[in-house]
Amino acid sequence: RRAAVIILKEFNGLKTPRVQALSRLYSCYSLAMDDIRPPKLEVYRDETVARDYDQRWSGALGKKRDVRKARAILKAFGILKEHHGVSFQNALDIPCGTGRFSDLFDAQGCHTIGADLSVEMLQQARTKHPQQDFLCADMGRLPFEDNAIDVGVCIRMLHLVHSSELRISFLRELNRVCKFGAIIDYRHSHTVRILSRKLRYQLGAYKENPQLPSPRQIQLELQQA
């Protein structure tokens, strides 16, 4: 918990005026900093992992997945804009990682704030996008006032979180700070890919048992948030 505060002080993403206008400053420890934080998320605090992260998406398959995800995000942006009849002034990308989609969000005409708990990933993002704002933040307790953000975007995150309690705490924070809604990458267990992995795990051919929520559980978690 103490380390989380130190990290915030080391990474000066909160010092930009535009972010300060939206933020409230406090110790960022929360449920997300307890022992139930998934070990997979800690991997991204490794400097080597952060430096090499973008290579995962540099091949043909990675680029294809990026294009597919970008289309889904843009479609969701359009639905939210049409539903509320407004143009978004700002967006929160969390966890932003190395800023893979920062340019995509900025192209929507709104100021994008990238947030992540990994300082190492944020350093890569700032190098790639020096004109944009990035800050170190715990998704379980975001340093923003209520409704300070127009729209939030959370991709490649919740499928790594096996605790329903922790997922709900993240969703509640997004609901609190996002005025018009959030775009969530929420993956469920009833897919051919996941069912195949479960079978391979049972046969000893896959090292980890997939622990994704069912579609029904996802609905319940969204309702609780």
Language-model features: locations:
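Short alpha-helix
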Residues: 209-225
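A short glycine-rich, Lys/Arg-flanked "PGG" loop and its adjoining helix->strand segment in the class I
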Residues: 168-180
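Conserved class I S-adenosyl-L-methionine
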Residues: 32-85
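Conserved beta-strand signature within the Rossmann-like core of class I S-adenosyl-L-methionine
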Residues: 179-187
